[in-house]
Design a protein with these regions (language model features):
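Solvent-exposed, flexible loop/coil residues
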Residues: 198
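Beta-rich carbohydrate-recognition and catalytic domains
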Residues: 1-8, 17-65, 69-120, 130-188, ...
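Conserved positions at the start
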Residues: 10-13, 63-66, 123-125, 193-195
Length: 207
């Protein structure tokens, strides 16, 4: 689209609406953090005037899959995905903040985590949907390394109960063979899907 804003260097885009404004997010790669010149970091841009977007938030270093969802009371659900000492290969956490200003690195990094998978696997949230006042549906991915060293990503869903802070177990809903064949970005990514754009149809149905 001629004249549309572009975001060079951003990967894995995501979108949500907060306070009636479009929020676009993505992973910037590479960025230099300390001595690591090939690190990554999420950035979020808010819809401004005349079709432009202004950067409003940068996520913690080396954390992907941060997602936001506005709740009925105006607060914001934050889905996190730390790795390393807290998260291993990748675990999903969540917290609720009053505004984006409160989504500080410390808050995001220390959000409580769900125990969704064994240590050799990892998970991440792709998008969140408000099901009822206190129930959140999450579309995400469950991933692992195969015996030949290549990656396997499957699409999964789970539900968060905001009252109890608990979640259901992830349920795999799709994998790569369910879709038409296509060229992967590299040979070790042939068995990978990264789902998004879920459209809710009502009566418990979606596509």
């Amino acid at each position: 689209i001629e004249g549309a804003p572009t975001f060079p260097g951003l990967q894995d885009p995501c979108v949500t609406i907060l306070d009636e404004k479009v929020i676009l997010g993505g992973v910037r790669f590479p960025v230099t953090i300390g001595e690591d010149s090939k690190a990554w970091q999420m950035e979020f841009y808010r819809e401004g005037l005349n079709g432009g977007f202004d950067k409003v938030l940068t996520g913690p270093p080396k954390m992907k899959d941060i997602r936001f969802l506005q709740l009925l009371d105006g607060r914001i659900l934050v889905l996190t995905r730390p790795q390393g000492e807290r998260g291993g290969r990748g675990r999903i956490g969540f917290c609720v903040v009053d505004s984006l200003i409160q989504a500080r690195w410390e808050t995001i990094e220390n959000a409580p985590l769900f125990d969704h998978c064994p240590e050799e696997q990892w998970v991440g949230a792709n998008e969140a949907h408000l099901l009822t006042k206190n129930k959140i549906g999450v579309l995400g991915h469950l991933a692992e390394f195969k015996e030949d060293g290549s990656r396997r990503y499957r699409s999964m869903v789970f539900c968060i109960d905001l009252e109890t802070g608990q979640s259901t177990e992830p349920e795999v809903i799709a994998e790569r063979p369910d879709f038409p064949s296509g060229a992967p970005k590299s040979p070790d990514w042939q068995d990978v899907i990264f789902s998004g754009g879920l459209l809710r149809l009502g009566r418990g149905q979606a596509r």
